Amino acid sequence: NTEFRNIWDLYLNNSTTDPVANNTATGDAAEAEMKEGKAVFYQNGTWEYDALSGALGAESIQMIPIYMGVAGEEKAGLASGTENCWAVNKNASEADQKATLDFMKWVVTSEEGTTMMAEQFGPIPFKSAKTPANVFFADANALLAAGNYNVDWAFNATPNVDEFRAGVVSALQAYGKEQTDDNWAKVVSAIVDGWAVQYAATH
């Protein structure tokens, strides 16, 4: 609670956007500010590598953990996870199902497939995965090699994710406009009570 508020205050009060207008900021604007040198920190993911490296050069960018004063975070690695998975449509024809499975196998085992995956998508969880040029993955691997732990996330575990997020975002926006203890208590409620409500609705 306190640690999250501290990092959120850091974001709000040191942003290129006025805290009162934080709900008008966009990801595209944040990316542009980073590329133009108007911002030095930009919270995003490995998918931003091409856009940032093209403008700034791979040697000028690095991904680091978000430090909030939480016990043990000095050994934290990067937050890493996915909300995507591969699936085969059970209603497709047998021929289409086989073609899909054959393609999946090709992507993760063949020279051409694994090269394409590394260059266009990054590392994949398979023994023959190639190392991508994306330095953000190298940063993550270096932290793991140094004995740091991975910070796992999986948004598909969030109950009623769209409704839950909407409640949290609304509370955070209200707090940005008026950074009071009462408004922060509403953020906490949106996360804690909101999760309980959405969990109950889906179980």
Question: Where are the regions a protein language model picked out?
Answer:
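Mature extracytoplasmic/periplasmic domains
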Residues: 31-32, 36, 47-51, 66, ...
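Conserved C-terminal helix/tail region of periplasmic/extracytoplasmic solute-binding proteins
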Residues: 148-203
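Pocket-flanking alpha-helical
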Residues: 49-55, 196-199
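Periplasmic solute-binding protein
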Residues: 75-90, 164-174
